[in-house]
Amino acid sequence: MMKIIFFGTPLFAVPTLKKLLDNPKIEVTAVVTQPDKRRGRGNKLIPSPVKSVAVAHNIPVWQPRRVKKNPETLNLLREAQADVFVVVAYGQILSTEILEMPKLGCVNVHGSILPKYRGAAPIQWSIYHGEAETGNTTMLMDVGMDTGPMLLKSIIPIGLLDNAVSIAEILAKDGADLLLETLLRLEDKEIEPIPQDNSLATYAPLIQNSDYEIDWSRSALDIHNQIRGFFPNCFTSFRGQSLKVMATIPVGTEYWSELPPELQKLEKVWSSESEVVGNIGEVVKVIKGLGPVVQTGSGWLLLWQVQLAGKKVVSGWDFANGTRLLVGEVSEVFSR
């Protein structure tokens, strides 16, 4: 039986931990996760999703603030004599000392097709850059950031209306399967690690607050990718208020084939009328039952779901009705 110590923290890591716990060939002897954090109105200490699963399965949980500087945790890791350390979105950098402890090494699953999108936010940036596909890569960890030799890969398509949350859910489940396969094949010596080609590497840094602000002078597709890549945080201003744009649809014949049934009306309405041109950031049309269409630096964008500050998320059509947004009578400009 393969002895595993699992390092992980957020919900993304939970499917992998559960997959390992359910496999009779694997024994998860301990879990290392981030310390509990205070959240909510009561400022209560809340455990990480990974800790909650571990506690439910009576697995020892270690929560050092800095794992590589914590002598007690280092001793526990050393004494455990694990075959593999599995690392999934743990949130701390592991030292060379830790990486060299397990017999077969430290195995990580990363949510991109390495060497592309190394770093903290691979899912978000892959969507932002308009990638048609993403995936998971398992690798043997080294001291670099996602630079270790690769083991197995999987490929996942990214649809026009997918966002960071929907893709993360898919990758979390896929990553669990891929990592389990990796461990079993690694134990049987069926995998030859492949070094990464650093010349092909791209990076996915931490997202800054400034990345969330919409610049309407960009193209409709670029803005659409920004909104779904950084979902649910992108915003603009409307009548002096912050307006979160939660979902959009780029308008044009090149996008019709990817629309779900409930949006087929957009093709019929737009195709039956001549295209309109307005100032950048201006609502050029309000489509009944769908919502406002905004002029961008190149092309048009339908606001499908929005959220005014302090309000609930509503459809673009309900937003247009609630704010009396009428093209012709009132030409509202969404300012940057």
From Swiss-Prot:
Please give the Gene3D superfamilies that the UniProt record associates with this protein: 3.40.50.12230
Binding of (6S)-5,6,7,8-tetrahydrofolate, residues: S112, I113, L114, P115
Record-level GO cellular component terms: cytosol
**Enzyme Commission number(s):** 2.1.2.9
Record GO terms (molecular function): methionyl-tRNA formyltransferase activity
- Whether Protein biosynthesis counts among this entry's keywords is yes
Alphabetized, the UniProt keywords read: Protein biosynthesis, Transferase
Catalytic function, reaction form: L-methionyl-tRNA(fMet) + (6R)-10-formyltetrahydrofolate = N-formyl-L-methionyl-tRNA(fMet) + (6S)-5,6,7,8-tetrahydrofolate + H(+)
Q: Which Pfam families match?
A: Formyl_trans_C (PF02911), Formyl_trans_N (PF00551)
**What role is this protein assigned?**
Attaches a formyl group to the free amino group of methionyl-tRNA(fMet). The formyl group appears to play a dual role in the initiator identity of N-formylmethionyl-tRNA by promoting its recognition by IF2 and preventing the misappropriation of this tRNA by the elongation apparatus.
Query: Family, per the entry?
Result: Belongs to the Fmt family.
NCBIfam families in the record: fmt
Q: Report the protein name in the record.
A: Methionyl-tRNA formyltransferase
Species source reads Trichodesmium erythraeum (strain IMS101)
Q: What is the lineage of its organism?
A: Bacteria, Bacillati, Cyanobacteriota, Cyanophyceae, Oscillatoriophycideae
User: What gene codes for this chain?
Assistant: fmt
